Amino acid sequence: MAQIKITLVNSPIGRIPAQRKTVKALGLGKLNSSVVKEGSPAILGMVNSISHLVKVEEA
């Protein structure tokens, strides 16, 4: 599977708890923090649920 780079660009403050937990589960903390993950269906589903908070690109 391809690797994807996920960057937190908008704050999870004021979002529903499930979205905040998803941000933490992906390993994102502060704004502009990035992680590289495998593009598995589970990770892609998590990214899709918080797509308005993150920027995704190929790593």
UniProtKB/Swiss-Prot annotation:
Gene3D superfamilies: Ribosomal protein L30, ferredoxin-like fold domain. The keyword Repeat does not apply. CDD domains: Ribosomal_L30. PROSITE patterns: RIBOSOMAL_L30 (PS00634). One of its GO terms (biological process) is translation. SUPFAM superfamilies: Ribosomal protein L30p/L7e. Pfam families: Ribosomal_L30. It comes from the Bacteria. GO terms for molecular function: structural constituent of ribosome. Keywords: Ribonucleoprotein, Ribosomal protein. HAMAP family: Ribosomal_uL30_B (MF_01371_B). PANTHER family: LARGE RIBOSOMAL SUBUNIT PROTEIN UL30M (PTHR15892:SF2), MITOCHONDRIAL RIBOSOMAL PROTEIN L30 (PTHR15892). Belongs to the universal ribosomal protein uL30 family. This is Large ribosomal subunit protein uL30. The gene is rpmD.
